[in-house]
């Protein structure tokens, strides 16, 4: 299936009326022919913004781009919003808004919010103006045809119901997790806590915990239920109760990575210095400044010794605890996280009858040590090996395709379907069981615009992580010893 086959001769969707943020609908789902919807349709046709209402100020892109600090101004659907006073209350964290300041955030906005009609209510008080007549609907340096084609692709995915989740799929994964958790306890109850039993239940709990990581990822991206509140409930239960980690901290951190993948210093996933130097520019920067906290020429060995075993029990656990107990913003949500996480430890104390408190804590961290390499390989194989740069303010499609790659998987559940990383980054709220359906359309669109759609074997992707670390180390050494 190709992208062009899903479009009509004029590039529009065949047999479907597009809807846009803020468009009203009649009871049967048909759009009301109001002025705002018609105006937006015309804007999309010519790629420029129409005459704004007289009550609103007019802005040029040059003026907006000056407000690119500390969540100042951003543009959504040709409208200009000042979010500086509201950023700290943003459910996705203030940093996401900081990263989009002074930019067209339309595609980001749509990608991260499944219930656009509700989010529009929060935007109304923040509206300060519109783009001036004649200004393009996105920054001038962006490819307007590419932006339009991706919007068409999004509408195609909606028309094919690719954003509708199969609840049975996620229910079976949830039941599998609970069965493994209960089975582990029953085995200890019947057979005691000897070493063979302990290692076997650790294996079961590792599968359960890894599956929980993937399920909380689904719920955190609001891709299970149509109503966000039910996704939040499932996310709290799985992330906090089953994994003992802060759901809110994960949201803030992970959404930054989605909005600005592989972009220094906005993507926290590549902010690993001084322990690891990633990409091409960061190692050279450290080398020229003669910075040597560790022997970076052996950082690929530290990947095996440090990153693989300590990612879950240390790298994720400590910042999660810090977010819950030390950070003052979003206090009410931190208290919710603390309550949920407390239930994780109470639940695990049921093993204390057989292992004691200290033995139970060792069991918890043994499982996290075993889970950690699994999650590291799955999450890092799609990003560390790809292009890293400072902010270049590219369009959504180009940003995501340059920073991510797909891997061939014989068993998608092993990776939580994250082997379709490109599709996941382009459509964060799409249920993962639909990634394979939209992948051919994405591949076709990338080919049309000359973007390299990377899809590699999984074992090669694993090896590329180490090869990327060695390459960065060599760049550091060249700059350090010159």
UniProtKB/Swiss-Prot annotation:
A motif (Histidine box-1) lies at residues 217-221. Residues 1-167, 212-305, 365-482 are cytoplasmic. It holds the Pfam family FA_desaturase. It is a multi-pass membrane protein. Heme binds at residues 90, 113. One of its GO terms (molecular function) is metal ion binding. Residues 1-31 are annotated as: Disordered. The histidine box domains may contain the active site and/or be involved in metal ion binding. Belongs to the fatty acid desaturase type 1 family. This is Putative fatty acid desaturase 2-like protein FADS2B. It comes from Homo sapiens. The gene is FADS2B.
